[in-house]
């Protein structure tokens, strides 16, 4: 079992994911990891046709676990929360190309018609003022033209509102005031709405501060830690 876990981590590039999270923890004060989730992975496979004797391409698919690194710039927790356990919800921002949005139609529980409608409405991404500096671009105009902004919500939702949005609930859940959901929105369209699949329900993120700030959600990184000492030395 231990060897299988190590192999799965290696195949899913978990080391690179952890490196990115640790880098942001040191630089910005907080690293964020999402998951684990299962994804369909395709592997090349050829099968000999018994009639023709020729090899035919027949890829195999299997479910594999995967974790993701989420940038602090794309992670919006409940503003009243100090830790993830206190958070009522979190929102993650995705910036996808047109083909990436279209690929969502092949993933489970995504609404194909809503995705098509969102694509027909055109790109919705607008760069924030700080992003040109972060990405070292003089202009983001060309980048903005072909990108779609998708907001992924994890948290509680009013039961009646969830049912109006097309979420099917079991009979024993109709009396609940709120339900835990995962909702994806693009161009104002709900492209995915499902119940939180985890038991017990939880927010599928791990937040790792470099140095804990007891009164804020995000931690303190190395540059902020060094700021006072560097100011004194420069003075």
Regions found by a protein language model. Give the residues of each.
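Extended alpha-helical, oligomerization-prone segments that build pores/tubes and scaffolds
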Residues: 1-235
